[in-house]
UniProtKB/Swiss-Prot annotation:
Its EC number is 3.1.11.6. Keywords: Cytoplasm, Exonuclease, Hydrolase, Nuclease. Signal peptide: none annotated. It comes from Streptococcus pyogenes serotype M49 (strain NZ131). Bidirectionally degrades single-stranded DNA into large acid-insoluble oligonucleotides, which are then degraded further into small acid-soluble oligonucleotides. Pfam families: Exonuc_VII_L, tRNA_anti_2. GO terms for molecular function: exodeoxyribonuclease VII activity; nucleic acid binding. The gene is xseA. It is found in: Cytoplasm. It catalyses: Exonucleolytic cleavage in either 5'- to 3'- or 3'- to 5'-direction to yield nucleoside 5'-phosphates. This is Exodeoxyribonuclease 7 large subunit. Heterooligomer composed of large and small subunits. GO terms for biological process: DNA catabolic process. InterPro entries: Exonuc_VII_L, Exonuc_VII_lsu_C, OB-fold_nuc-bd_dom. Belongs to the XseA family.
Length: 446
């Protein structure tokens, strides 16, 4: 009679075979990811091809080091061991390593991270800072021994001597490189004497340049308050640091040129050009003022100053005549009133009435004289004030105070810019005039 095995015994036997089979200890398998749903820790999914499917397990530690995100339908190459799960009698592969089929893991990780950061807005143009036109100190984050720092120093020194270069020695590849780049970007931003940063390194493989594709480096450049120029690898190399930086330079020399957009020669030419423009503007202004002075000096007021106050003198004469006639009329009227009063009083027998009329006459006379005197004083004061204002414009009075008036060809001279060596001048003074010849002209500001 045949011995029947229990399901448990058969399963244990098969598991023992699986565990002891050297071919199942390390299996190289290609398949398409199926039934994948990302979990917080361990990942469970299927690998399939056109004819078969196998369950797959990836522990959390392996998944964390994967470097790219698993996606439904992605074809991958895995290394793992096949095991049998006794309770269900099913077998699966426990994946120890995986990479995309046909494309490197780093290349896939690059594309996935680029897609993620693009969606989050890290590379948008609106976040880019403008580079300053003039800098006094540039921070450089790179290896102290590479050609990058030498090229930057040489180019900056040639384009704008005097600009300082501050090197932040940084590990640019391998373990810990990304962390050093981030730390030095933050150190540079704590300084107040830097105008911008250049972050870069020489060329290399994608593995060599990978520190500049790390998300923490992208975030540090994005958060930098200092404008950042990225110069990573050769012209054909592109990293995520290039996308997030404010400007990307193909070479260290190009980065140095971007950092010093205006050379010292350009600046000096600009200063000279501005000086010339300012000088010409000043000359035009002086010429305009001189023409105004010349025109004013030839006006009627300066050639015949007495005509300035002729009209006022005539008005004063008219007012004086009017005042005198008014005073005469009022005196005549007062005399007539007095005669009438005297005649009336002569016919009166009352002494008190006479005295009262006499008092009224005396009061009226005083008021009249006071009013006439007040009007006369007021008109006289106005006349004297107008006369003083007009006489202050009289050149003869100005000369009388000790000043001199210089004429050239009967035209008033107001500035030494009107005079040249050999000119014949007339100097008018209070007691005569001098005819002189100019021996020398010196410009001095008073």
């Amino acid at each position: 009679m045949a011995d029947y095995l229990t399901v448990t015994h058969l399963t244990k036997y098969l598991k023992l075979k699986f565990d002891r089979d050297p071919y199942l200890e390390r299996v190289y398998l290609t398949g398409q990811v199926s039934n994948f749903r990302k979990r917080p820790t361990h990942q469970y999914f299927s690998l399939k091809d056109e004819s078969a499917v196998i369950q797959a397990t990836m522990w959390a530690g392996v998944y964390k080091k994967l470097g790219f995100d698993l996606e439904e339908g992605m074809k991958i190459n895995v290394i793992g061991r096949v095991q049998l799960y006794e309770p269900s009698g099913s077998y699966s592969i426990v994946i120890e390593k995986a990479e995309p089929d046909g494309i490197g893991a780093l290349a896939l990780q690059f594309e996935q991270l680029k897609k993620k950061l693009t969606a989050e807005g890290y590379f948008e143009q609106k976040h880019k800072q403008p580079l300053p036109q003039f800098v006094s100190k540039i921070g450089v984050i790179t290896s102290p021994s590479g050609a990058v720092i030498r090229d930057i120093i040489t180019t900056v020194s040639r384009r704008f001597p005097g600009v300082e270069i501050l090197l932040f020695p940084t590990k640019v590849q391998g373990d810990g490189a990304a962390q050093e780049v981030v730390a030095n970007i933050r150190r540079a931003n704590q300084r107040e004497d830097l105008d911008l940063l250049i972050v870069g390194r020489g060329g290399g493989s994608i593995e060599d340049l990978w520190a500049f594709n790390e998300e923490i480096v992208v975030q540090a450049i994005f958060e930098s308050q200092l404008p950042v120029i990225s110069s990573v690898g050769h012209e054909t190399d592109t990293t995520l640091a290039d996308f997030v930086a404010d400007r990307r330079a193909a070479t260290p020399t190009a980065a140095a040129e971007l950092a010093t957009p205006i050379t010292k020669t350009d600046l000096m030419s600009w200063i000279v050009e501005r000086q010339n423009r300012s000088y010409q503007a000043c000359l035009r202004r002086i010429k305009q003022r001189q023409e105004w002075v010349d025109k004013l000096s030839q006006s009627v007021i300066f050639r015949q100053p007495e005509r300035l106050y002729d009209a006022y003198l005539q008005k004063i004469d008219r007012l004086s005549m009017t005042l005198m006639n008014t005073m005469k009329d009022r005196l005549s009227s007062a005399k007539e009133n007095k005669v009438q009063l005297d005649h009336a009083l002569a016919n009166s027998q009352l002494q008190t009435k006479i005295e009262r009329y006499q008092d009224r006459v005396a009061t009226a006379k005083r008021l009249l004289m006071a009013n006439m005197a007040s009007q006369y004083d007021s008109q006289l004061a106005r006349f004297e004030k107008a006369q003083d204002a007009l006489l202050s414009l009289d050149t003869s009075r100005i000369i009388a105070r000790g000043y001199a008036m210089i004429e050239k060809n009967q035209a008033l001279v107001a500035s030494v810019s009107q005079i040249t060596k050999g000119d014949q001048l007339t100097i008018k003074m209070r007691d005569g005039q001098l005819d002189v010849e100019v021996k020398d002209v010196k410009n001095e500001n008073i």
